């Protein structure tokens, strides 16, 4: 019997729910490496839950899996959106569910991997995204304000109007901050209050990789240096030469924004690198609002444990425990 055979029929009330493994944690914590190692032993497919890794042509600063890794193991929702192509949270949620169902059909374990809390919550909690039509005039005014005064200004506005929504949205993702403010503006209510939850019929096991903050800071600082060595400047130059403007939401990601500013003469390369490190540290702190060590629904492991055979046994135990919601 395959690993999924015993859980087929997730929508039938008298049958066990189909399994979904989630690997989460801070940027630079080794999530992708763990997922790939597991998929080499257990029939599985990897689904991206990182809002930066959806874009094509943007590989180095987003730290995507390598091409050889993607060819060896089924990967979903990586590099499928052009840098100037609009893409909504609702679209991601729909595609993620399709990928999960596809893997179940293939008798493979779906492994949802990423550090974008909003992507993870939208899928795991079954958010019903508010169907509010865009207000282009309102949007344009906010984007202009963010460009002139900085994204922090409009994020602060969101924090005042809807503190709960502010904890669920990456402050660097200007497009999503604008969308939340737009919904608040058009409905008169809170964006967070409009998110109706309808959890999908999956038996979920969440594994979180925890690395002490100072150790993680050192790790990501070294990764920033490595990105420069791998050709990040050339990658950003290529994007700009192809007509992808630095003001695009995709270009607001760490690494692209700073190197674009350096290329355009706004800052030195040294300043760009320091800003990349600072923003990565900030992202780690932001992610910690999503991924808390006190969350008993997450099975936390160390980096060393993520590299051990014990983690494989843990996942096998999860697959064997059809009627349990947690593995301890």
Curated annotation (Swiss-Prot):
Site residues, Interaction with substrate tRNA: 116, 139
Q: Where is this region: Interaction with substrate tRNA?
A: 50-53
GO biological process entries: tRNA modification
So what does this thing catalyse? Answer: adenosine(37) in tRNA + dimethylallyl diphosphate = N(6)-dimethylallyladenosine(37) in tRNA + diphosphate
| Record keywords | ATP-binding, Magnesium, Nucleotide-binding, Transferase, tRNA processing
Pfam families, sorted: IPPT (PF01715)
| InterPro entries registered for this protein in UniProt | Dimethylallyltransferase, IPT, P-loop_NTPase
GO MF terms listed in the record are: ATP binding; tRNA dimethylallyltransferase activity
Task: Report if keyword Nucleotide-binding is assigned.
Answer: yes
Which parts of the chain span the membrane according to its record? none
Cofactor(s) recorded in Swiss-Prot or TrEMBL: Mg(2+)
Cite the binding residues for substrate: 27-32
Binding residues for ATP, per the UniProt record? Answer: 25-32
Q: Which family does it belong to?
A: Belongs to the IPP transferase family.
Q: Which NCBIfam families match?
A: miaA
Alphabetized HAMAP family for the sequence: IPP_trans
| Subunit annotation | Monomer.
Task performed by this protein = Catalyzes the transfer of a dimethylallyl group onto the adenine at position 37 in tRNAs that read codons beginning with uridine, leading to the formation of N6-(dimethylallyl)adenosine (i(6)A).
Q: What is this protein called?
A: tRNA dimethylallyltransferase
Q: Which gene encodes it?
A: miaA
């Amino acid at each position: 019997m395959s690993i999924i055979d015993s859980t087929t029929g997730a929508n039938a009330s008298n049958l066990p729910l189909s399994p979904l493994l989630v690997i989460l944690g801070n940027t630079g914590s080794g999530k992708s490496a763990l997922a790939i190692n597991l998929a080499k032993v257990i029939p599985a497919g990897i689904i991206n839950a990182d809002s930066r890794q959806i874009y094509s042509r943007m590989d180095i600063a987003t730290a995507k899996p390598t091409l050889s890794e993607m060819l060896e193991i089924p990967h979903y929702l990586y590099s499928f959106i052009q840098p100037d192509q609009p893409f909504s949270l609702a679209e991601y949620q729909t595609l993620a569910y399709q990928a999960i169902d596809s893997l179940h059909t293939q008798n493979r374990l779906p492994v949802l991997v990423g550090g974008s809390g909003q992507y993870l919550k939208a899928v795991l909690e079954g958010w019903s995204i508010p169907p509010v039509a865009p207000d282009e005039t309102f949007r344009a005014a906010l984007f202009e304000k963010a460009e002139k005064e900085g994204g922090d200004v409009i994020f602060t506005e969101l924090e005042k109007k809807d503190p709960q929504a502010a904890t669920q949205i990456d402050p660097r993702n200007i497009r999503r901050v604008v969308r939340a403010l737009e919904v608040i503006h058009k409905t008169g209510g809170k964006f967070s209050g409009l998110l109706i939850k309808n959890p999908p019929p999956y038996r979920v096991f969440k594994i979180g990789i925890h690395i002490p903050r100072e150790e993680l800071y050192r790790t990501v600082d070294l990764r920033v240096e490595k990105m420069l060595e791998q050709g990040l400047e050339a990658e950003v130059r290529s994007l700009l030469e192809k007509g992808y403007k630095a003001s695009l939401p995709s270009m607001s990601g760490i690494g692209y924004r700073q190197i674009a500013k350096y290329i355009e003469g706004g800052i030195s390369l040294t300043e760009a690198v320091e800003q990349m490190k600072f923003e990565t540290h900030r992202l780690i702190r932001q992610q910690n609002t999503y991924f808390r060590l006190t969350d008993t629904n997450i099975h936390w492991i160390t980096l060393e444990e993520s590299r051990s055979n014990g983690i494989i046994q843990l996942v096998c135990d999860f697959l064997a425990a059809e009627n349990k919601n947690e593995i301890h």
